[in-house]
Amino acid sequence: MGQALSIKSCDFHAAENNEEHYTKAISSQHLTLRRGQSFTITLNFRAPTHTFLSALKKVALIAQTGEQPSKINKTQAIFPISSLGDQKGWSAAVEERDAQHWTVSVTTPVDAVIGHYSLLLQVSGKKQYPLGQFTLLFNPWNRDDAVFLQNEAERTEYVLNQNGFIYLGTADCIQEEPWDFGQFEKDVMDLSLKLLSMDKQVKDWNQPAHVARVVGALLHALKKKSVLPISQTQAAQEGALLYKRRGSVPILRQWLTGQGRAVYETQAWVSAAVACTVLRCLGIPARVVTTFDSAQGTVGSLLVDEYYNEEGLQNGEGQRGHIWVFQTSVECWMNRPDLSQGYGGWQILHPRAPNGAGVLGSCSLVPVRAVKEGELQLDPAVPELFAAVNASCVVWKCCEDGKLELTNSNRKDVGNCISTKVVGSDRCEDITQNYKYPAGSLQEKEVLEKVQKERLKLGKDNGMCPPSCEPWDPLHMFFEASSSIPLSGDGQLSVTLINPTDEEKKVHLVIGAQALYYNGVLAAGLWSKKQLFMLKPNQVMRLSTNLSFSCFEQTPPENSFLRVTAMARYSHTSLSCFAQENMAIGKPDLIIEMPKRAAQYRPLTVSVRMHNSLEAPMQNCIISIFGRGLIHREKRYGLGSLWPGSSLHTQFQFTPTHLGLQRLTVEVDCDMFQNLTGYRSVLVVAPEVSV
């Protein structure tokens, strides 16, 4: 090197810096930083620096990212190493020095482009020495970052927590699904940035709104390409771990590399969880939200059609959308300087069909407040999102002669139960009030009137309330059903009929049951029952019946729900009364016993018990246990068969390796069902701390 100033090595102090930047869970070897926050490096020179005084005055650092780094697009920065640092832009200041070592504090801008960076040392404006690579992420801890979150508990939950829940089931029977987001798994950051690299507008990667929309659009496209149809699901049902849905990382690997876990049509709700993983990994606070009884495919219409045959079973889909049992979405937190004041905070990531406007045209980012206030003009996706939680359902009866008859339906309104995980707790939180005003309130009335006027102005109004079908000779019907039915067991149904007139009525009653998937798609017709009776003047009649698996024409498919319906008509009119309820299918209880605290590197025993309350044997039982920081790899054990009325009791031992709150998940699969899951959390402490 002659007499030129040269670098021997550079110490990035990855472990220490990552600790300060809340990224130690990602890596202790690779420097991973959050923007707008300083970090420390040590430059080790080959010779004493005092012999190169003239060169020292021209020493600078270069930070660059992307395929074609440029100052113009903010993907390259050249900044001097001085004794003073600039807290607003890229800067470097010497903190300590001796003959051959400099300790330098480097500060990144709070609006820097995120991604993988190279850091170089430049001497005299010419010679450059590569120092190494680092990764820059968004910073919810920095008040000036657009993703700043004020509350530390919320930052911990929405950025750092790798364990969560997705809420499935029905509005009356919410079922928690333990979910491993795994945003800090070793390859997730690289996979997330690989996904982002499909967008060539690297200069816009400093804007969380842009990044979130890109993530939403690209994941949606990958899902469309990768999700397998139900027919393939059924054909491959005997294949390996078909219905496993334990976490985001295997799915993300499959979508981006082809090596991971496939997703099937009946599980496509997992895409929200995968998006949540990527956003949290990149430093954008995110959470998965479930809307029960959600109107989908409405194109903004506030009326949804459903069609049922004379047996009370669903008969195709309406032209104005349909009602999903539940729908999952992902919200992310950020300021929105591109919108009017007041629209920052939680934003809904809403992928949609491409419209020719590039990748961003395939995904909207809609403020939750805009949905609540019915601001249809704010974003093209607002009308559809508003309808998802405010639409009304119109039920039609398809007669044998091909005619359609409007029913007098008491179908519940949609979007009255919206849930997510409570911060710092394993409980479920109802956040419906974020999306809509209380039913019957003055605010709700004002918003609905505003939306109706806006739709009229746009020429899209088709009415906001279901058409009236009150008969001159009425019959009233009320339908009650259990919120869930045990697998292979019975559920209770009751129909109350009221004749408010002075004339006797001959009533035809049909009760039906069918299996459907979470997205409202019919899976199978299962059962129907007809009754004919006379209802006396002013009589109230209550009819009860058992809904039994033993009466079903076939076993409901995995991941399906039951929709039970009641349809009544009487002789003097063709008008039918209609009511329906969705029922979750309950599985046996899984009881897990484990200490709440455990010592790191010391064996821990867990006990698992399960009772077969079904009327049939549970054959080919397989139990799986897994948990990051607790078990190195998933453990699977064959347990044979469990006969009706008998119980299973087994124990496992493992050695925790990671400190902090960890989650153990236990899963049982058999010929009767898949994905019977339970979990327990354990606080792992250092060995010297008393347990």
Swiss-Prot record:
Pfam families: Transglut_C, Transglut_core, Transglut_N. Keywords: Cell membrane, Cell shape, Cytoplasm, Cytoskeleton, Erythrocyte maturation, Lipoprotein, Membrane, Myristate, Phosphoprotein. GO terms for cellular component: ankyrin-1 complex; cortical cytoskeleton; membrane; plasma membrane. The modification Phosphoserine is found at S248. Residues 31-39 are annotated as: Band 3 binding. SUPFAM superfamilies: Cysteine proteinases, E set domains, Transglutaminase, two C-terminal domains. The keyword Ubl conjugation does not apply. Gene3D superfamilies: Immunoglobulins, Transglutaminase-like. InterPro entries: Ig-like_fold (IPR013783), Ig_E-set (IPR014756), Papain-like_cys_pep_sf (IPR038765), Transglutaminase (IPR050779), Transglutaminase-like (IPR002931), Transglutaminase-like_sf (IPR036985), Transglutaminase_animal (IPR023608), Transglutaminase_AS (IPR013808). It is found in: Cell membrane; Cytoplasm, Cytoskeleton. Its main location: membrane. The modification Phosphotyrosine is found at Y570. GO terms for molecular function: protein-glutamine gamma-glutamyltransferase activity. GO terms for biological process: cell morphogenesis; erythrocyte maturation; hemoglobin metabolic process; monoatomic ion homeostasis; multicellular organismal-level iron ion homeostasis; regulation of cell shape; spleen development. PANTHER family: PROTEIN 4.2, PROTEIN-GLUTAMINE GAMMA-GLUTAMYLTRANSFERASE. Component of the ankyrin-1 complex in the erythrocyte, composed of ANK1, RHCE, RHAG, SLC4A1, EPB42, GYPA, GYPB and AQP1. Interacts with SLC4A1 (via the cytoplasmic domain); this interaction is mediated by the SLC4A1 Band 3-I dimer. Interacts with ANK1 (via ANK 1-13 repeats). Interacts with AQP1 (via the C-terminal). Belongs to the transglutaminase superfamily. Transglutaminase family. This is Protein 4.2. The lineage of its organism: Eukaryota, Metazoa, Chordata, Craniata, Vertebrata.
